[in-house]
Each structure stands twice: as structure tokens, then as C-alpha cells.
């Protein structure tokens, strides 16, 4: 029995010692109890050490106090209260908003609280533009915006909010003027959709647009969203903005129009120079002051309407000569005013030019072969029809002699009063062009290639 009692005392003492060796231990002033294992010691207080330099025994932990630190059993450590998994929600605008039946409150942002349908009937019901779905007693159907029921009458918004119908849903919008209203029919002084105080207009932007060659237009600002879930502070958004845009109907360049009179041969004439040809006939034709043709700075030939004055004495009178210009490009052409005719110098290319300036013969415009033509002012009455050989041609008292363009052989020709007869000098290729610059004959100088041009300036009636 004594042994059993002793064992119980030892166990009790051991339990108490393991529980806290410093339990009921009182140390002198400036000393503190330290438990190491199952022993308690009184040690001087050293506050500067703290728990970082003091280690407690097994099953104990150091606890700092205002003026000291001590070792406490670990099982005496109070367990912290666990935080709730979800904090209590703060009151929102929906706590102060009353929506119509079958509508639920949704906080879009701090400025917008919308009442949206609590079912998906109208959400999946498609309505055309200008109408909205309304789920009434007859079920979902589309109602025009003008006849859509104003659900704001049965909607109550929280303080400082005003109800507006947005896409068929009552929506509470914050009043920016600070005026509180609970009346569904109240209209705030400043509507949230009102444009801000200053928005750029075309009055300010037009000078900058015009300087860049653009025009100013006023368009709807795509940044202002009107959807319920996209509504932001619309007061800070300009509903209409001014932009610089290109004018699709305007022209970027000026149009230059030229007046082109038409001669008797049907070819176009462009004015830039003056040609005067005076012709008199006394038994034969005489070609007076030569033709003058100037070249424009762009390299294209410019030929003026020719004025021909014709007088006859005992001979036929030809119609006023025609100067026709259909030339696309005439480069480097210089025509001097010689005594006997036309002088062409360094004519490189003359394309598509038809010049008819005959006194008494056939005027051919752009035709290489003349068939069955009768020359009306010919001395010998020559009719040329695709002729390669010209015979029995008499030129009497001619200054310019016989003008032959593209003729291979001239047979039996008599020049009665010609100074130099017919002269062709270094004509490499002369295609349907005759240039006379001689007192008594024909002179073609350094004409390399003249293509597609027909010049008729004959006295004796030959026109090629």
C-alpha cells in the first residue's frame, strides 16, 4: 500500500514538473525563473537578450512580455480564432434598390445599378431594332421603344440615384449634381448622358483639317457605350466628336480644258502659234510667206490655225488652207520662215501629223494613197491615182517648185521658172512628209525619220 501511494506521488510530481517547472517558483528581484527540462532555475534578468537568445526546454516556448520573457508550456498557447471563410458583405446599392417583379438587382459599377430579368426568356428572345423584349402576361413579345412600359414607375433606386430605362431595363444612375430623388418621374438637373462642358467641334478643328487637305466632319463617338453593362461615366464622354476626314467628292487637281477648233479636213487644231499663207495664181500658183510653226516647252508641237488668203487671175481658187495638228509628240521641230516654202530642221520624230496646204490640188488628211483624185488648180490637169510615176507635169513661175512626197520617180517634169529645180538632200527616210526651204526647189535637210505625216504643198496638183 505504501509503495502504491509513493508511486502516485511520484507520478503527480512528475506531471507537475513536466507541466511547468517554474510553476509556483518565486525568484528574487531582478531574477526570473528558467525551466530547463524538469528543473527550474532563477537567473538574472537580461532584457536585451530576449527570446532570440533564450531557448526553453522541450515542450516549452519563450514568450516575451513587456518587461521580461518566460517559458510557457506549448499546450498552454492559445489557438488563434480562425477567420471566417467569407467576410460579411458590405451593404451595396442593391440593398437600397427595389426592382420590379421578375427582375433582379445587379451592381454594374459604383455609378450604375441595373434591374435585369431574372429569367432567360427575354435574354434569348431576339427583337428587331427599335423594339425590346417584354415578358408580360402573354409571355415574351417585342414592344416598340415608344410603347415600352416605363418600369421606373415601379422601381426604387437608392439614395443619390435616378432611374432611367436603358434597353428595356430599369437602371439606376448616380446623380452627378448631388441631388437625391426617390421619385421615379424625377429628372435630374444634369442627365448622365449630357455631353461635358467642352467637346471639340468643327469650328475649332476646321482650320487644321483644311491645312492638311481634309474636311471636318462631326460623327457619333463610338467610345460612348450605351449598353447596360458597358455604361460608364457618360458625362465625361463627348457624344459627338469632330474629326478630319478625306473628302471623297472633291478633286485633288485642277482640270485644264482647252478649246480645240476643227478645221475643214476634220482634224484638231491647237492654238499656240500663227501661220499665214497668202497664195496668188497667175497661170500658175505662187506660195508666199512661209509657214511658221513653234514648239512648246514640253516638246509637243503646237500649230496654230492657218489663215490663207487666195486670189486668182485666170485660174482656180482654192479653199482656205487648213493646218491640222493631231500630233501626239513632236520633239525638236524648228520651222523657219524661208522665201520659198517650209524648212524643217532636225526633225527626229513627227508622229501622226497631217498637214494640208495645197494651192490648187488635193488635200489629203492622214491618207498615204489617193485614188481617183483630181487636182483642181493644176496647170497640166493631172489626176493622180496611186501613182508612182508622175508624168507631164509643168510648173510655171513657181517659187517652191514641185513638191513630191514619197514619189520614187518623177518623169517628164518641166520646171519653167524654177531657180534650182527639184532638190532632195540627204533624205534618209522621208515618209509622207515634204519640207521646202529653197527658193526654187525642194530641200529636205537632215530629216532622219518622220513617220505617219502627210504634207501636201503642191502647185501642180500632186498630193501624196
Curated annotation (Swiss-Prot):
Span of domain Follistatin-like: 21-43, 121-143, 151-173
Signal sequence, start to end: 1-17
Keyword line: Glycoprotein, Repeat, Signal, Sporulation
SMART domains: FOLN
Annotated region (Disordered), positions in chain: 250-320
GO cellular component, one term: cytoplasmic vesicle
Gene Ontology biological-process annotations: spore wall assembly; sporulation resulting in formation of a cellular spore
Glycosylation sites: 111, 247
Keyword presence, Ribonucleoprotein: no
UniProt KW Cell wall biogenesis/degradation keyword: no
Highest taxon above the source species: Eukaryota
PANTHER family: LP04239P (PTHR35365), MUCIN-19-LIKE-RELATED (PTHR35365:SF18)
Function field: Forms a triad with cellulose and pspB that is essential for spore outer layer formation.
Domain remark from Swiss-Prot or TrEMBL: The N-terminal part (18-235) contains the information required for insertion into the coat.
Subunit structure: Binds to the C-terminal region of pspB.
Name of the featured protein: Spore coat protein SP65
Species this chain originates from: Dictyostelium discoideum (Social amoeba)
Phylogenetic lineage: Eukaryota, Amoebozoa, Evosea, Eumycetozoa, Dictyostelia
Amino acid at each position: 500500500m505504501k509503495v502504491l501511494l509513493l508511486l502516485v506521488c511520484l507520478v503527480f510530481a512528475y506531471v507537475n514538473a513536466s507541466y511547468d517547472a517554474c510553476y509556483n517558483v518565486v525568484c528574487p528581484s531582478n531574477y526570473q525563473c528558467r525551466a530547463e527540462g524538469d528543473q527550474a532555475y532563477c537567473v538574472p534578468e537580461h532584457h536585451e537578450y530576449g527570446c532570440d537568445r533564450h531557448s526553453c526546454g522541450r515542450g516549452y516556448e519563450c514568450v516575451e512580455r513587456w518587461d521580461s520573457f518566460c517559458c510557457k508550456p506549448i499546450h498552454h498557447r492559445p489557438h488563434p480564432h480562425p477567420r471566417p471563410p467569407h467576410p460579411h458583405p458590405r451593404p451595396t446599392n442593391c440593398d437600397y434598390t427595389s426592382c420590379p417583379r421578375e427582375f433582379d438587382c445587379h451592381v454594374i459599377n459604383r455609378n450604375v445599378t441595373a434591374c435585369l430579368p431574372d429569367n432567360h426568356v427575354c435574354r434569348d428572345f431576339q427583337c428587331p431594332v427599335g423594339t425590346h423584349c417584354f415578358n408580360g402576361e402573354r409571355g415574351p413579345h417585342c414592344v416598340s421603344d415608344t410603347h415600352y412600359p416605363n418600369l421606373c414607375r415601379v422601381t426604387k433606386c437608392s439614395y443619390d440615384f435616378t432611374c432611367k430605362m436603358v434597353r428595356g431595363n430599369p437602371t439606376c444612375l448616380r446623380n452627378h449634381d448631388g441631388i437625391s430623388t426617390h421619385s421615379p418621374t424625377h429628372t435630374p438637373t444634369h442627365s448622365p448622358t449630357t455631353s461635358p462642358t467642352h467637346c471639340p467641334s468643327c469650328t475649332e478643328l476646321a482650320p487644321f483639317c483644311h491645312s492638311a487637305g481634309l474636311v471636318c466632319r462631326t460623327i457619333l463617338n463610338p467610345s460612348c457605350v450605351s449598353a447596360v453593362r458597358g455604361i460608364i461615366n457618360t458625362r465625361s464622354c463627348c457624344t459627338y466628336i469632330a474629326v478630319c476626314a478625306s473628302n471623297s467628292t472633291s478633286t485633288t487637281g485642277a482640270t485644264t480644258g482647252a478649246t480645240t477648233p476643227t478645221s475643214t479636213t476634220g482634224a484638231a487644231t491647237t492654238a499656240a502659234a500663227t501661220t499665214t499663207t497668202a497664195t496668188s495664181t497667175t497661170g500658175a500658183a505662187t506660195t508666199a510667206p512661209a509657214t511658221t510653226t513653234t514648239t512648246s516647252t514640253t516638246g509637243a508641237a503646237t500649230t496654230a490655225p492657218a489663215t490663207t488668203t487666195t486670189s486668182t487671175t485666170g485660174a482656180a481658187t482654192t479653199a482656205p488652207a487648213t493646218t491640222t495638228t493631231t500630233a501626239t509628240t513632236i520633239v525638236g521641230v524648228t520651222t523657219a520662215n524661208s522665201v520659198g516654202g517650209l524648212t524643217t530642221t532636225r526633225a527626229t520624230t513627227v508622229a501622226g501629223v497631217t498637214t494640208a496646204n495645197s494651192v490648187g490640188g488635193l488635200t489629203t488628211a492622214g491618207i498615204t494613197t489617193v485614188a481617183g483624185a483630181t487636182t483642181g488648180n493644176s496647170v497640166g490637169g493631172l489626176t493622180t491615182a496611186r501613182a508612182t510615176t508622175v508624168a507631164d507635169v509643168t510648173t510655171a513661175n513657181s517659187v517652191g517648185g514641185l513638191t513630191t512626197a514619197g514619189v520614187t520617180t518623177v518623169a517628164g517634169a518641166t520646171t519653167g521658172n524654177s531657180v534650182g529645180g527639184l532638190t532632195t538632200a540627204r533624205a534618209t527616210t522621208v515618209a509622207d512628209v515634204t519640207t521646202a526651204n529653197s527658193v526654187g526647189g525642194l530641200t529636205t535637210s537632215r530629216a532622219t525619220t518622220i513617220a505617219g505625216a502627210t504634207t501636201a504643198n503642191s502647185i501642180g496638183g500632186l498630193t501624196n
